[in-house]
Amino acid sequence: MLFACSSSRVQTGNTNDTQYSEINSDSLYALRVSFFSIGSGIDRKTRQDYDRFIKEFEQKNNVSILLDKATWGKEGEIDYCIKLNNLSTELQEQFIRSTKDKIKDSKLVRLYENTTCKYKI
């Protein structure tokens, strides 16, 4: 196991071929909200509700959510890659809790925390 201060190492490839790629802490996102499809498109209602939630959160708290959108797939699949380091700890926790609450009923949305933006170009 390898450790580094500003980046982490991730093993790629098979176990016989040891190759490592660097993940810089700047490329990590607090959240990745992934709207995916299993043959009939994404959950558009949940996406619209989540877009509305982000705008309302920004207005209510006078902040900007740092959001990168990465599209992938052929049925509208999209990842919302969100950095929250410009928010106070309290607002970060509130945003994460609210995000979990907004997407909890959808079977076509996944949430990842402290991760990279998989499809970002």
Which residues does each predicted region cover?
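Short edge beta-strands and adjacent turn/loop segments
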Residues: 20-29, 64-75
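Short amphipathic alpha-helix segments
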Residues: 44-65, 99
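Immediate post-signal-peptide N-terminus of mature secreted/exported proteins
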Residues: 10-44
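Surface-exposed aromatic
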Residues: 71-85
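C-terminal partner/receptor-binding element of secreted or periplasmic proteins
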Residues: 93-121
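Helix N-cap motif at beta-to-alpha junctions
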Residues: 39-40, 85-91
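Short beta-strand elements
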Residues: 60-70, 110-115
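C-terminal motif of bacterial Sec signal peptides marking the signal peptidase cleavage site
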Residues: 2-6
